[in-house]
Amino acid sequence: MASGADSKGDDLSTAILKQKNRPNRLIVDEAINEDNSVVSLSQPKMDELQLFRGDTVLLKGKKRREAVCIVLSDDTCSDEKIRMNRVVRNNLRVHLGDVISIQPCPDVKYGKRIHVLPIDDTVEGITGNLFEVYLKPYFLEAYRPIRKGDIFLVRGGMRAVEFKVVETDPSPYCIVAPDTVIHCEGEPIKREDEEESLNEVGYDDIGGCRKQLAQIKEMVELPLRHPALFKAIGVKPPRGILLYGPPGTGKTLIARAVANETGAFFFLINGPEIMSKLAGESESNLRKAFEEAEKNAPAIIFIDELDAIAPKREKTHGEVERRIVSQLLTLMDGLKQRAHVIVMAATNRPNSIDPALRRFGRFDREVDIGIPDATGRLEILQIHTKNMKLADDVDLEQVANETHGHVGADLAALCSEAALQAIRKKMDLIDLEDETIDAEVMNSLAVTMDDFRWALSQSNPSALRETVVEVPQVTWEDIGGLEDVKRELQDLVQYPVEHPDKFLKFGMTPSKGVLFYGPPGCGKTLLAKAIANECQANFISIKGPELLTMWFGESEANVREIFDKARQAAPCVLFFDELDSIAKARGGNIGDGGGAADRVINQILTEMDGMSTKKNVFIIGATNRPDIIDPAILRPGRLDQLIYIPLPDEKSRVAILKANLRKSPVAKDVDLEFLAKMTNGFSGADLTEICQRACKLAIRESIESEIRRERERQTNPSAMEVEEDDPVPEIRRDHFEEAMRFARRSVSDNDIRKYEMFAQTLQQSRGFGSFRFPSGNQGGAGPSQGSGGGTGGSVYTEDNDDDLYG
């Protein structure tokens, strides 16, 4: 039942975004008739709207744009569509497939005079009289309706010229009759000024926050457009909206879009600009802004960076800030009832704003504009790429899935980076010195998926800029052996990120974390890196000792910050290396500054529990002293799975050697299996060291032989004409034999016994290996070895002391 209610509530919250179906709402379609003043409808639709052929109609498009046209009937047009050509579409700021409304406009007067100006780049190099060649034939006997602000295109004399209607009398629209005076004197209009008004932001240019847009629309547009609604129901319309969220999510953009779409007077106050050095002037600046807005109501006042002018009063030492906050409070209370002034503010630090501002009646609605999810990111990418030339192989959905934690600004940067990369590929054809670039080159430019791939590798989300989150370049192939551990990790991290639907189906929240423990040099850190790389999650690595600082309370704040960042960039893997340095058992360590270490542990414990389940944040801890870690961290729900990473057995050692030597040329007669057999008890790091040393020896030999050959060439130039082979083409057996002389085991048997004991005690405390349900359902056999049983049974079952590395 609850889910039904939820879905209903969901529908209501975005109800304002739905287009209402009315007979005069029509879908824009491409025109057959190329005339700029004509739109065509189907005959049944014209009858329904009571229009006749040749009537003047008023069309309303996006961003409050209007146009007047003559309507004709067209039998090929379907009932719900309206055909209009590109000029009309541009004047209405609509694209094909958008919805516009149409209404009859019977009282259009004949114009006394109109003033049109050409747009500069379309009249370059044209000689002769513009009026005679273009305007006169265009308007002759046509009785065209025009509206102030329209741009129309006239073809004639081999060229097409665009004109803009600057003024009409009577305003704002009229019909150009034969006796209308047409002025076309004056400077041509610059294209740039036109483009700017074309690039106004509308709701279509905002992706990834549908719900928030709906909230803002009902808070801003309803009171401004239909104040009677609120009067009828007897409540005061809301006064203020506070938009908050991480930087780059589009707070200022939303405010701009609202201003453009509502057509309200928009007054922008940038926080820091109000401040003035003269006493009392900062407040009067604020007062002036509010007075100005009230004069021009309906109006929207937008305060950007609110935290700059309204910080908490008890925290600030400056007298000016306090007075400004008080002034803002009184102004917002004293906005005359229904003065149709709405105050919007944006900040990315909502908690540093004076609490008096956040009560009802001032900023009563706080809209959290968060980091977009995958569908939101797809919307944003589509908006940014709608003017880009994309190759056919570009899969924006995949790009959206791979950009976890990116906000709108990051995605915009990603698109421009990809486009730049596409240009770089053609750089050999482009000459900077040339005046123009070949049209061929221009037309061949297209952004491919590879360009996006490259841009993806370059960009990281802005939420994580200071903790540089690199997805490591380590794959499963770099890790030899440890098959069971890899499986376990995939279950833990990859599945919740890649198949969240399965977890919903079985009603399970994914587990939060794992602890790797085992002797040093067995690849604990490497595993964590590989898992972050495999599932394309963000990866924050935290070195234990770095969290502790000398200042009181700072260490805990560091922990909080790290967890906040991880939540913002979810899915994210938090990797605590050397966990034992910050999570020692509490109470034992006397003498550290006021129990700082204990407080850090407490902070970590609360953060792990309080990690909201919606976010995919995983914690991986690694330690080689599991015995001194606080037991509270090891309980299920925090680090539920304890995975013992043993010394590699023979098979794993072969795999490690192979993984290490993947990129090196090795002689055929080097028997890695024999090498693995001989290195019993060596950890992964020790084996890597052997390989490195063998490589070093080969490199040294190669360099020395080159020097020797160079000397011989100098002493006897004639004899050395013959080009010799490379003296050391690959790593030979003797290099490995030499390297083995220096090889040593870094982990003693004693250490291993300690780990074995720890693993064994864990095993005993959860040893329900023989658990079976009573015989009714023979099928359900219990898990082979307690729920989190480490890496296969082999490690624990062998009792003989000789073979500790099974």
UniProtKB/Swiss-Prot annotation:
N6-acetyllysine: modified positions: 502, 505, 668, 754
Membrane as UniProt keyword: no
Reactions it catalyzes: ATP + H2O = ADP + phosphate + H(+)
Record region (Interaction with UBXN6): 797-806
InterPro entries with a match to the protein in the record: AAA+_ATPase, AAA_ATPase_CDC48, AAA_ATPase_domain, AAA_lid_3, Asp_de-COase-like_dom_sf, ATPase_AAA_core, ATPase_AAA_CS, Cdc48_dom2
GO cellular component labels: cytoplasm; cytoplasmic stress granule; cytosol; nucleus; site of double-strand break; VCP-NPL4-UFD1 AAA ATPase complex
Chain intervals for the UniProt region annotation (Disordered): 708-727, 768-806
GO terms under biological process: autophagosome maturation; autophagy; cellular response to arsenite ion; cellular response to heat; DNA damage response; DNA repair; double-strand break repair; endoplasmic reticulum stress-induced pre-emptive quality control
Protein name: Transitional endoplasmic reticulum ATPase
Modified residues annotated as Phosphothreonine in this record: 436
Glycyl lysine isopeptide (Lys-Gly) (interchain with G-Cter in SUMO2) cross-link site: 8, 18
N6-succinyllysine found at: 668
